[in-house]
Regions:
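Transmembrane alpha-helix signature in integral membrane proteins
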Residues: 9, 16-17, 21, 89-120, ...
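Hydrophobic alpha-helical transmembrane segments of membrane transport/permease proteins
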Residues: 16-65, 156, 160-173
């Protein structure tokens, strides 16, 4: 396991380096307005002097080296547009907590409803609970997310008696965005748990339990469900972290001052330093989620040995 994790972390670091470096290079192809708050009022000489002071006239490999050197010391530069001369790390530290809170609540909601739904669907395969659950999953996956997000906001704000401007101090303002963020994962957990339970139900140990007279409910809860949860567990950390960093539309829709709205604003206003800092954070979060998924899977089922799996390839 340790050897596997070492290899996985090494590959993840390489992936992180490639992704962020590629984005860094692409941002250098963008107009230079993103580095100056008052670009329209500046002369060409002032622009060139500013670019020189920021090191943007250096050769690209030199710029990449300086970026990673500073990033490894916790310095992602300063915002030039969003908040003039404010450190990128400070802005990220201000915006990330509310996105994490939203993500935690959405994950809990999706697990609380998605796991029981998948369990019931797997237990009653082909019967009306399974058919109703399947219809719900198909509806969530077939309809574009933006459509049901808008409907939830349209009818939910009236029913909840809340406005369109988010108020973090009032719990009612959290209900609609959290419900919206949880729907996709709820359907995902239910669909895959149902599928894994159906697969487990056809295995020999289940047939043996039935032959011994064990009740179907006992088999479903204590044997099939437990084994079906093992492959599903590895997706929970990455699903949670993807919810945190992938809530761009939800946060913009409800004016939530989190990471999603920050990315949209910085892209629209061409704040290149902020964009590359956000991309670095997102890449780190995604990679951490994948590694945590593997670790959690082994903790739940010690029979899994990634080292042997890799060695057999």
């Amino acid at each position: 396991m340790v050897q596997y994790l070492a290899k996985r972390i090494g590959r993840s670091i390489l992936t992180l380096f490639v992704i962020v470096t590629l984005v860094f290079c692409l941002l250098r192809l963008m107009p230079v307005e993103g580095y100056f708050a008052n670009y329209e009022k500046m002369t060409e000489a002032q622009i060139q002097a500013g670019l020189q002071s920021m090191g943007l006239l250096d050769p690209l490999p030199v710029q990449i080296g300086h970026f990673w050197r500073d990033a490894l010391h916790g310095d992602l530069g300063v915002s030039h547009i969003y908040k003039l001369n404010a450190p990128v790390t400070r802005i990220l530290a201000q915006k990330l907590p509310i996105s994490i809170e939203m993500g935690v609540l959405a994950m809990l909601l999706s697990l609380i409803f998605g796991i029981p739904l998948g369990l019931v669907m797997g237990r009653y395969k082909g019967r009306w609970p399974d058919k109703l659950g399947t219809a719900f999953i198909v509806l969530v996956q077939a309809v574009p997310a933006a459509v049901y997000f808008l409907y939830i906001q349209m009818y939910g704000t009236t029913a909840m008696g809340v406005g369109l401007l988010f108020d973090a101090a009032n719990w009612r303002y959290w209900v609609l965005p959290v419900c919206s963020m949880s729907l996709a994962n709820l359907a995902f957990y239910a669909m895959w748990l149902r599928r894994y339970m159906v697969d487990e139900s056809n295995k020999d140990y289940v047939k043996l339990a039935r032959a011994k007279g064990v009740s179907e409910n006992n088999i479903a809860l204590h044997h099939v469900f437990r084994n079906a949860m093992v492959p599903l567990v590895q997706y929970i950390p990455s699903a949670f972290l993807n919810t945190v960093v992938g809530s761009i539309y939800i946060e913009s829709l409800y004016s939530i001052p989190g990471m999603g709205g920050l990315l949209v604003t910085c892209v629209q206003r061409h704040d290149n330093t902020m964009v590359q800092g956000i991309v670095l954070l997102y890449a780190c979060v995604g990679i951490i989620g994948l590694i945590l998924g593997d670790v959690l899977m082994v903790l739940i089922d010690p029979r899994i040995n990634f080292g042997k799996k890799e060695g057999g390839r």
